[in-house]
């Protein structure tokens, strides 16, 4: 059954506010430990009012993940228009993606939600994002800016490293990321730049 919601500007805005609050709470507590009343508290709503916009807590989490993936889609679109080598594209993507609140939730998708209708869409989006990153890496190898090696293995190592850094530093926005941004950029250069390797 679909939630009872008409797409009026006021209700769309309230739904977006619930999503933003949910991103914050899920990021802090995880899907299983987060409570609906924690999500609605700052919005002066009752926990039951969420069901006016979402069918369940699981449905809300799915929509949270999709909203984060949409932000990544827009970022990828912007980066693809940049006239730079592919090492710079990967560095820019990393810098911008790390400031997205809730980014680590993409790596914490509970398997218990696999029966939800949009779960397959999330996995398809994830596969597409990985494919784009791998394409950048391969093109970087072709233009001479990236080192040789298996792009999928490099991606897995980088994303895993960034996942833990994101959690340790509680990165939520540009301000909190700015403190470690130089370290991340240097790390990517050390890992992937052919120019950096030649200077050693």
Can you say where each PLM-predicted feature lies in the sequence?
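All-alpha amphipathic helical-bundle segments outside canonical DNA-binding/catalytic cores
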Residues: 87-91, 123-126, 142-159, 175-179
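C-terminal peripheral helix-coil segments that are non-catalytic and often amphipathic
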Residues: 1-2, 92, 131-142, 160-161, ...
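Short amphipathic alpha-helical elements of helix-turn-helix/winged-helix folds
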Residues: 21-25, 100
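Short secondary-structure transition hinges
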Residues: 98-135, 142-145
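Short coil/turn segments at alpha/beta junctions that flank glycine-rich nucleotide-binding fingerprints
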Residues: 28-32, 82, 143
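Hydrophobic alpha-helical connector segments
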Residues: 63, 74-103, 155-158, 196-200
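Helix-turn-helix
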Residues: 2, 17, 25-59, 63
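Generic hydrophobic, amphipathic alpha-helix propensity
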Residues: 14-22, 39, 64-68, 72, ...
């Amino acid at each position: 059954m679909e939630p009872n919601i008409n797409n009026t500007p006021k209700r769309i805005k309230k739904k977006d506010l619930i999503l933003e609050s949910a991103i914050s709470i899920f990021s802090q507590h995880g899907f299983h430990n987060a409570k609906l009343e924690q999500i609605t508290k700052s919005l002066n709503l009752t926990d039951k009012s969420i069901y006016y916009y979402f069918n369940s807590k699981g449905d809300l989490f799915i929509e949270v993940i999709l909203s984060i993936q949409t932000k990544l889609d827009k970022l990828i679109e912007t980066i693809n228009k940049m006239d730079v080598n592919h090492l710079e594209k990967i560095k820019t993507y990393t810098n911008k993606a790390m400031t997205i609140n809730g980014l680590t939730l993409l790596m914490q998708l509970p398997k218990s939600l696999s029966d939800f209708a949009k779960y397959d869409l999330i996995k398809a989006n994830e596969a597409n994002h990985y494919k784009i990153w791998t394409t950048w890496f391969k093109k970087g190898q072709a233009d001479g800016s990236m080192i040789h090696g298996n792009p999928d293995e490099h991606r897995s190592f980088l994303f895993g490293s960034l996942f833990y850094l994101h959690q340790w530093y509680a990165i939520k926005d540009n301000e909190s990321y700015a403190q470690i941004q130089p370290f991340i950029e240097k790390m990517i250069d050390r890992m992937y730049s052919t120019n950096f390797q030649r200077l050693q």
